[in-house]
Amino acid sequence: LKPFELSFEHNEQSRRIVEELEQVYPDFHGLNLTHEVRQGLMKHQTPWDQKNNHFEGASLEAQVVNLSDEIAYNNHDVDDGLRSGLITENQLQNLPIWQAATEKVTQTYGEIKDQTIHRARTVSKMIGLMIQDLIEASNPEKNLICFSPQVATWNKELKDFLADNFYFHPEVLALSKRGQQIIQDLFANYHQSPNHLPKEDQQAISTGVPLEIVIKDYIAGMTDEFAEAERERITSL
């Protein structure tokens, strides 16, 4: 998108989906969502998103969703890393959040010899610890959802660990590069041959929506499996 002075921001794309692209009502585009829900979509942040944007405090619902998303992603990535063998439990032993979760698992179940079950219960305990901490640390007088200082530190250490040992692992980077190539191939093909796009997208182009925006919207809605299959389809035409 850079050559066309465009960029992809998942918050903005979420807004486009719920306000413009979804067509389930006869008299207007988008979904019938409240202002608070749409505001939450735009204010959802990660350390990599919207670096130059500064928002007023999001609604409580949006704050809860934002931190719940972080809990889910971090712990799911730990589970993925362990399942794939790219990280090990021994590596995680230095993380206080893993130590605390392991201790609780031992207190509850004793020694678990099955590593698959032990991993599942420990990741589940990490999720439980973070959720319980959010509940206890959120101060209604400040109207703010947050971790306590201790678990905020644990969470940062967990994210740093994932960045150092999982996100930039050679196998993960190779998969990421492959995904980028698939997206680039799709974009280039559609841009050169718009007739390869679905008929509804071709219709959008005919009504004046820029081709690059239509392609962006279409690719953004693809699953990994569909994107791979679609590249195979259009390159064989």
What are these regions (language model features)?
Residues 1-5:
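Short helix/strand-bridging catalytic loops that position acidic/His residues to coordinate divalent metals
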Residues 7, 11-13, 17-237:
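Histidine-centered, transition-metal-coordinating active-site segments
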